[in-house]
């Protein structure tokens, strides 16, 4: 009796293994052809670079993030699917153009008039009188430094910027250093490379409330009237006003469980191992992509600048401490201590690189810390990593003060800007 039972169990186990193997193969195959599956199944840092024939082809590979003429908080996205006005091509003679790269912080999870890049353009126009300028917002949610490199390679010739601005979000553009130290066991390695596991985990997170752009409860889309061609940056319904107190602009956005998962992924970027070589190894791919961007920009005779956008975990020590206390209840993070974290780690790595590469850089973290102390008005949405309208204002003011010296043709300097 035992032999048939064992045989049955063996057959069942073999069937399960075979099913998992087939599933793994199908997911890997689907990830090659489907951008949506690839985004869910392949960690961003492990996605193989893809060759694109054009910038349009690259944008088409981001269908969940780049939606032409999308209604975004009652303002149209442009024809490329970016949160900006329509771009003038070719660039008008005499215009100073900035091409801004970044993720959802640059894209802006607020209405178009309130995004940091829209405000940056207005601020620079005010402090650089007589300068014809524009800021092209190429922020795309869910992207990283490797994507910024792709956009530079494919877009510089068409849009002809005088200055390329990289908006580096320390919360997820920085590498996951914690993983390099504490997740090298065989079991975790198997799960880490399994695309089937990653797809299932991320699909569940999406079902629980983690949305592509994190703009939960954004105002519903409105159909385009027949015969009307939408123009980026213009109101969908001029008679409709989206209140600054709309829950989609203030939060809470995510469930507590989903937001804890987001913050956990961010805090791992601030882990400081005892061996400095681990940090260097983790940062090598990121710095390699930044160097490739610098090389391409300089080859075309253009200028490059970098701004560091802080995570809320860097701005609010209490949030950082509370998250560590929560994580320590899990066996996976039982040994984690607040002393093992250095919230300035990404900033210091970038400062060293910028100095070595002779790139002008600004770290917005001190500005946000000061702004958090000067007013109780939130800089970040509740249960979301993204900025409120005030956070976008603070970022725009700081970047304008930084960039004025690079942009103003008359040599006029930006005024001192108090925290907003």
Q: Which residues fall in each region the model found?
A:
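Generic structural signal for small/hydrophobic residues in well-ordered secondary structure
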Residues: 24, 103, 148, 164, ...
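N-terminal Sec-pathway targeting helices
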Residues: 1-18
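Serine-dependent acyl-ester chemistry module
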Residues: 169-359, 369-370, 416-417
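Membrane/wall-proximal cationic-aromatic binding patches
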Residues: 35-128, 333-339, 348, 368-378, ...
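Histidine-centered active-site loop/cap adjacent to the catalytic His
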Residues: 9-11, 22, 381-420
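Conserved SGNH/GDSL esterase-like catalytic core that processes O-acyl groups on lipids
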Residues: 74-75, 88, 93, 97-99, ...
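Second-shell loop/turn segments in exported
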Residues: 104-110, 137-138, 279-283, 337-340, ...
